[in-house]
Amino acid sequence: ALGDLIFVTGAIRDDGTSAAYVEAQYPAIPDFDLLSACRESAVAENIPYHLGICRSHSCLYGDRNPELYSYWARKRAIASDMETAVLFVLGSLRGVRTASILNVVAASQSSVAEDIGKYAAKEAISMSGEEREILTALEAFTRIQK
């Protein structure tokens, strides 16, 4: 649902940038402890969330190729963005803990442009997801420091 959080368990490296740092066979995965802390934080605050794979790509909110989104959805990718794969790859290569918390701002099978327009207009449901992203991340950081 719009405003839910997604904790990315791995990213499909369809972004281009991560390939500049390491071969395509290198996995784009988060730090397990930080990912777990994010999940624990959401559970503690009753924040709706999903765990799953994200497709990172090089196109800003493009919906000109719906078949491509359908293809990856059939492969169980539950989200798409532009940053997660490179974040995970660089974090892993440099020994930095990473996790990716996404806010659902466009629903599957809906108009991406329309849903992004609602987000840009600061509709309450999308903005509440953004606030929950920030709070969850801050709480997760405190959890892994204990």
What is each residue range found by the language model?
Residues A1-K146:
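Glycine-rich phosphate- or other oxyanion-binding loops that anchor nucleotides, phosphorylated ligands
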